[in-house]
């Protein structure tokens, strides 16, 4: 069964809604330019209130390895998601398992993947304006091809309305959503969270 990560968590209330709906992982954004940005202190407080067996993922964009590792330790993150232009050797310096994000324009966007020894690859839609969270989709046939390189997490413009088709088309290891289940940036809509997870998992 496909796994689901709800990203851009900014409150314990939203986190618990996602957990109760069946989310496998929660994402916390440590990128100042994002409307879903949280501080390490905020994230640590939310994570301390979670039940066991829920994975926590910290999202970073072009931050120094020392900041990434320090934040991961302070917040007790399970995984680190690198969503910027980090090279393979950067991933090797991270002290947690790494999810490396790649922004997809076309099939050539997959070329760098083979150089990264990471826990999973995340594919998101390319935008010149932002590193992620844009709500844009991309060609899912490209995503299906990326599975040859290891566990694939599909992101980019997913919503309750299209996630079932995405899962059936790509058959990814996991799907990742943020804006597609929000009522406003950084505010999750409980009904949309529940419906997204239900449809993603085929319940």
From Swiss-Prot:
GO terms for molecular function: phosphoribosylanthranilate isomerase activity. Pfam families: PRAI. Its EC number is 5.3.1.24. SUPFAM superfamilies: Ribulose-phoshate binding barrel (SSF51366). GO terms for biological process: L-tryptophan biosynthetic process. It comes from the Bacteria. It catalyses: N-(5-phospho-beta-D-ribosyl)anthranilate = 1-(2-carboxyphenylamino)-1-deoxy-D-ribulose 5-phosphate. Pathway: Amino-acid biosynthesis; L-tryptophan biosynthesis; L-tryptophan from chorismate: step 3/5. InterPro entries: Aldolase_TIM (IPR013785), PRAI_dom (IPR001240), RibuloseP-bd_barrel (IPR011060), TrpF_fam (IPR044643). Keywords: Amino-acid biosynthesis, Aromatic amino acid biosynthesis, Isomerase, Tryptophan biosynthesis. Transmembrane segments: none annotated. Belongs to the TrpF family. This is N-(5'-phosphoribosyl)anthranilate isomerase.
